[in-house]
Curated annotation (Swiss-Prot):
Gene transcribed to yield this protein: fkh-9
One annotated Gene Ontology cellular component of this protein: nucleus
Name of protein: Forkhead transcription factor fkh-9
Annotated InterPro entries: Fork_head_dom, FOX_domain-containing, TF_fork_head_CS_2, WH-like_DNA-bd_sf, WH_DNA-bd_sf
UniProtKB keywords: DNA-binding, Nucleus
CDD domains, per the entry: FH_FOX
Organism in which the protein naturally occurs: Caenorhabditis elegans
DNA-binding region range list: 66-161
Keyword rRNA processing attached: no
Phenotype of gene-disrupted mutants: RNAi-mediated knockdown severely impairs axon regeneration in a daf-2 mutant background, in a daf-16-dependent-manner. Impairs short-term associative memory in a daf-2 mutant background in a daf-16-dependent-manner. Reduces longevity in a daf-2 mutant background.
Subcellular location: Nucleus
Tissue: Expressed in mechanosensory neurons.
Low complexity: compositionally biased ranges: 187-198
Highest taxon of the lineage: Eukaryota
Length: 300
């Protein structure tokens, strides 16, 4: 029995040794760097690129024609394409990239986006609409919309910005003219230059308005002045008739009618002819009233 067990163990040991020798004799294959590892992918995964991915570096804006629209028209086009006719700033960028590949493939994305922001703040046809909700960072955003009535007109914001500049230019021009006038007066020149109009100083005593004139006082003063003029001329024997008085009357009447044509009725009521020859009974200048009185007294 012992001999049988010993023979079985020897046979098992021999078989193991044979298997070990066979493994040592077989060549061992080591993979090289040139070998590729093939990994099978599921058939459900598509090999087409996603439209959200960044364009390849090989594509550039040189391969696409730049649109002829201005930045203002690009913004209006993007907002009109939206269903609610309003877009956020990033949405305006996305619509412009989608409609015009030139801006999608431009390397300087910040350049044309900065121009979009500038035109939004420049033209008054673009209006901000506040958002009702806030973003995750707590920043309140806003929509941009277009006012159709102002889309075809010039911007009011640009005119408002130019008005202070225009006023400053006018004030500078006025100061330059005043300096030129002082220089010309100091050098003895009397005639102003034809290219530089003369600026007259404002009148310190402005004329009163027609409404402030007291017509009755003016007419009464005119009659007093006529009487004084007649007496002075009579005493000095300078006039033989009342032609000077009538000329003064006609001059004053014409002046008043030019100031206000409605004074004709008042002039007729004032009785401007109360100092004519028929009423004043002019005596001969050769004999004064005092001498005539003394002669009549002596005759009595």
């Amino acid at each position: 029995m012992c001999s049988t067990m010993t023979a079985t163990m020897n046979q098992t040991i021999c078989e193991k040794q044979n298997i070990t020798m066979d493994l040592l004799r077989s060549p061992i294959q080591i993979p090289s760097a040139s070998d590729t590892i093939k990994i099978e992918t599921p058939s459900t995964i598509s090999s087409q690129p996603s439209p959200i991915q960044t364009p390849l570096a090989a594509a550039s804006s040189d391969n696409f024609e730049r649109p002829s629209l201005s930045y203002k028209d690009l913004i209006i086009e993007a907002i009109d394409r939206s269903p609610e006719k309003r877009l956020k700033l990033n949405e305006i960028y996305q619509v412009i990239r989608l409609l015009h590949p030139y801006y999608r493939h431009r390397p300087d994305q910040w350049g044309w986006q900065n121009s979009i922001r500038h035109n939004l703040s420049l033209h008054d046809c673009f209006v901000k609409l506040p958002l009702k909700q806030t973003s995750a960072s707590g920043v309140v955003g806003h929509f941009w919309t277009v006012v159709p009535e102002l889309s075809d007109k010039q911007t009011l914001r640009r005119r408002n910005r130019q008005q202070p500049r225009a006023l400053a230019k006018k004030s500078d021009a006025g100061r330059t003219l005043s300096r030129d006038d002082r220089g010309s007066s100091g050098s003895g020149e009397t005639s102003p230059s034809p290219s530089q109009p003369s600026i007259s100083p404002p009148n310190e005593n402005p004329m009163p308005s027609v409404q402030a004139l007291n017509v009755l006082e003016l007419l009464s003063g005119m009659n007093d002045y006529k009487g004084t003029l007649f007496q002075n001329n009579y005493r000095t024997n300078l006039i033989q008739d009342n032609s000077a008085v009538n000329g003064l009357q006609n001059l004053l009447t014409t002046t008043l009618m030019q100031i206000n044509p409605q004074l004709g009725a008042l002039l007729s009521l004032a009785n401007l002819n109360n100092l004519t020859t028929n009423q004043l009974q002019i005596a001969s200048p050769s004999l004064s009233p005092i001498k005539a009185e003394s002669q009549s007294f002596l005759l009595q």
